Amino acid sequence: MSSSSPSSQSRLSVPGRTPHLPPLTIPHTVSAEGLATPNTPHALLPTGLLMGSPFVQSPTSYTSMHGLPFSTTQMAAAPAHPTTGYNVSRVTSPNVANFAPGYFPLPNNTTQPVKTVYVGNLPPNTPIDEILSCVRTGPIESAWILPEKNCAFISFLDPSHATAFFQDAALKRLTIRGTEVKVGWGKNSASNSSVLLAVQQSGACRNVFLGNLPNGITEDEIREDLEPFGPIDQIKIVTERNIAFVHFLNIAAAIKAVQELPLNPKWSKRRIYYGRDRCAVGLKQPAYFSKGQVGVVGGYPVMGYPPPSPVLQKPDLIMTGNRTVYIGNIHADTTIEEICNAVRGGLLHNIRYLQEKHICFVTFVDPVSAFRFFEMSNIHGLVIRNRRLKIGWGKHSGPLPSNIALAVAGGASRNIYIGNADDSLTIERLKEDFEEFGEIEYVNFFREKNCAFVNFTSLASAINAIDRIKQKKGYENYRISYGKDRCGNPPRTNSKSDVLSVSSDMSMPVDLVVPQQGISGFMPTNSNI
């Protein structure tokens, strides 16, 4: 059996294909609450902060579409687009090669998990939004339709989601407008690196959220302003909430819209960010619970890209890229200090405790750390004051602000170290002098070591304090720098109950760091050391 593929030029001209992207920036500013909001362009979080995470492991082998392991050597030696060894018996249509260029049935010896699904035998004039309404297995990178061939191609972010859709459509005999469609595998192609980076760091997807819309705005008006960024799949307006969701046919177009739409004076005062891909609504039970059924390793199977992050292997985080974890069912007498004593696994960007509502929102610097805390707390449970807490995902935090990312790369944390402390320095004085820079979580003083620590609820407040505290009278002779955020320590479990818990014994200096060169992860800033 033979099949023809279009030239590279014709492939690029197909509507809905992922276009070339310039170096990526994501609009944002920092609101009064310290949360990222999209308004002005800034550089993304340095990749080292995520890809350098100790939780990101390089895979030693991958799994083929038939569940057979193969090595990276075999992968590198294999052709990018296999054209021989197809199992003809698996072809869903005997004449499928004549239906659409670029279509390939499932090969026997493929060395890359395939992420593009072919949908053929479509009824004439079928709109692509009806086709995508049948997809519920995971977020889509791009989709395009060839009306003259009565077929469409759907390219997923994760090959396991493509396989799940393929199997589901084949088993249930997918029907559109009363016609049973044919499913097969499309030709594999590399994902755009800028798109992968945006998915990894910002939770980018095809869906663009529009908030704070004026009364009476229409779908036609939204389409007119957003269609220049790329082909649109669907627009949904929620009139009573003055919000809308615009699904593009590819993530690249959504990224461009999020970047450039805030620069339009008409949209400058609107809330613009990523929503949730409607094709991922079926991910109530994450795919990593059923990898054996799918037979495909999650992540991006493209040679030359970084190894997959745990964030990208968990569908809940593919959809959001979230750094904020919700904590509920908190005892009324619990203090923010006790919550921070229980949070472990990564540096905190900020923590917001709503004591009257018995809830708290913890935002990490790294989304991998947020996922790790979320997963550990749900597996082992998190207990404070003998009450098991409820753990969930908070509202999307957005990307880490660039100024915070640069400060973290230089050793910043929300903990301020004050060395050479004398008898004139007291906890009360520290609270009074530092509270002008932001909300303080707690102050710890160690007389025997002549040092103290001031922990803020926000990393931005600590950065502000480091920059300005030396200008305050009486602090000229103190050694001032960043300390160690105790929330970055490994999780602690109760060996008897295997439950994450917090000790009430605060006599140990859990955040004590004596600043000196050579300490891993510590870099004094604006200090007299």
From Swiss-Prot:
Entry-annotated residues carrying Phosphoserine: S93
Region feature Disordered, mapped onto this chain: 1-26
Biological processes, Gene Ontology terms: negative regulation of conjugation with cellular fusion; negative regulation of transcription by RNA polymerase II
Alphabetized Gene3D superfamilies for the sequence: 3.30.70.330
Comp. bias (Low complexity): 1-13
Keywords for this protein: Phosphoprotein, Repeat, Repressor, RNA-binding, Transcription, Transcription regulation
Keyword hit for Cell membrane: no
Record carries keyword Repressor: yes
Known role: Negative regulator of sexual differentiation. Acts by repressing the transcription of meiosis-inducing, ste11-regulated genes until cells reach a critical level of starvation. RNA-binding protein that preferentially binds poly(U).
Cellular-component GO terms for this entry: cytoplasm; cytoplasmic stress granule; cytosol
UniProt-recorded Gene Ontology molecular function terms: mRNA binding; poly(U) RNA binding; RNA binding
Domain RRM: 115-188, 206-277, 323-396, 414-485
InterPro entries assigned to the protein according to its UniProt record, in alphabetical order: Cwc2/Slt11 (IPR039171), Mrn1_RRM1 (IPR034195), Nucleotide-bd_a/b_plait_sf (IPR012677), RBD_domain_sf (IPR035979), RRM_dom (IPR000504)
Protein's recorded name: Negative regulator of differentiation 1
